[in-house]
């Protein structure tokens, strides 16, 4: 299992292309407070990164071409968030440089782990560094929001409490627990979950302090379990070991443990026909840890 570990000497000697992490995220809780007139939902959610995810290899080109490999089976390159992020940064900064981008995709799509958003954020943050385009984190987050609601969280690179439609962000320091994360063999459309008439949409807003000091939950869970028995089955299995719930709109579920040994013991009992991993929660993104060491 590949986790993100960096030493200063390793990075100093790193050959091109540079290799940047795109960590997964978990929604430790997710509450839906209402639906706005524009169709978007008001949320309160707590994001934390985990020490596991995709990789993006980047080689700077002297021309302004953006080349992304490999092309994902279900997605044209022009629609891939990595490609779109690179083009957006290039256009907004009038950068004359280009890049060869190679995405090592480990996280499944439609999983609730934020893989696509993390890929886009890594492209923005890493290219801003390599191209020396000198945008601030705030400016990069603004570009990220044009690509997806979760992208700014990954751009900021810090565990955070998000409100509204995800645009109001408060940095947070939840406990860095160990997680078993599993994905049943289904993909779930976020739009389908949010349009379901049975979705809870009226959870009262609470302060961050109140939310952090009560049992965590996910308002999307009931709808997802009703429609996807595979998710229900895997969640029940995890609940035998530890507090467990859905992340985002699924399909992934996670169980939280206080130490790695307990998490590994539970993980070893799970049938191997699921995508899954054990990883520690991180309040600072591995991407930002890496950049802090090489800049």
Curated annotation (Swiss-Prot):
Question: What Pfam families does the annotation carry?
Answer: GHMP_kinases_C, GHMP_kinases_N
Reaction catalyzed: 4-CDP-2-C-methyl-D-erythritol + ATP = 4-CDP-2-C-methyl-D-erythritol 2-phosphate + ADP + H(+)
Q: Which EC numbers does the record give?
A: 2.7.1.148
GO BP terms, alphabetized: isopentenyl diphosphate biosynthetic process, methylerythritol 4-phosphate pathway; terpenoid biosynthetic process
| Domain of life (superkingdom) | Bacteria
Where, by residue number, does ATP bind?
108-118
Q: Which InterPro entries match?
A: GHMP_kinase_C_dom (IPR013750), GHMP_kinase_C_sf (IPR036554), GHMP_kinase_N_dom (IPR006204), IspE (IPR004424), Ribosomal_Su5_D2-typ_SF (IPR020568), Ribsml_uS5_D2-typ_fold_subgr (IPR014721)
* EC class of the enzyme, as a word: transferase
- Family according to the record: Belongs to the GHMP kinase family. IspE subfamily.
Q: Which HAMAP family match?
A: IspE
Main role? Catalyzes the phosphorylation of the position 2 hydroxy group of 4-diphosphocytidyl-2C-methyl-D-erythritol.
- Per its UniProt record, what NCBIfam families does this chain match? ispE
What name is this protein filed under?
A: 4-diphosphocytidyl-2-C-methyl-D-erythritol kinase
């Amino acid at each position: 299992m590949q986790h993100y570990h960096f030493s200063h000497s390793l990075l100093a000697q790193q050959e091109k292309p540079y290799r940047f992490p795109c960590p997964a995220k978990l929604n430790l809780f997710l509450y839906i407070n209402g639906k706005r007139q524009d169709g978007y939902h008001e949320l309160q959610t707590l994001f934390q990164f985990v020490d596991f995810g995709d990789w993006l290899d980047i080689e700077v080109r002297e021309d302004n071409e953006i080349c992304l490999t490999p092309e994902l089976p279900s997605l044209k390159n022009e629609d891939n968030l990595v490609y779109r992020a690179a083009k957006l940064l290039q256009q907004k900064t009038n950068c004359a440089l280009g890049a060869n981008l190679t995405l090592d995709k480990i996280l499944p799509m439609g999983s609730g782990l934020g893989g696509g958003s993390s890929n886009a954020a890594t492209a923005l943050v890493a290219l801003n560094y390599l191209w020396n385009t000198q945008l601030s984190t705030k400016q990069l987050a603004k570009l990220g929001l044009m690509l997806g609601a979760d992208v700014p969280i990954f751009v900021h690179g810090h565990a955070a409490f998000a409100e509204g439609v995800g645009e109001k962000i408060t940095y947070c320091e939840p406990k860095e627990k160990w997680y078993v994360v599993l994905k049943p063999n289904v993909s779930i459309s976020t739009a389908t979950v949010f349009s379901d008439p049975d979705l809870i949409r009226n959870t009262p807003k609470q302060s961050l302090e109140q939310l952090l000091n009560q049992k965590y939950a996910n308002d999307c869970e009931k709808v997802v379990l009703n429609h996807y028995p595979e998710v229900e089955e895997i969640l029940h299995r995890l609940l035998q070991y530890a507090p467990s719930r859905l992340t985002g709109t699924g399909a992934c579920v996670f169980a939280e443990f206080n130490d790695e040994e307990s998490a590994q013991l539970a993980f070893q009992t799970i049938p191997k026909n699921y995508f899954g991993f054990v990883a520690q929660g991180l309040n600072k993104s591995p991407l930002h840890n890496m950049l802090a060491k090489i800049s």
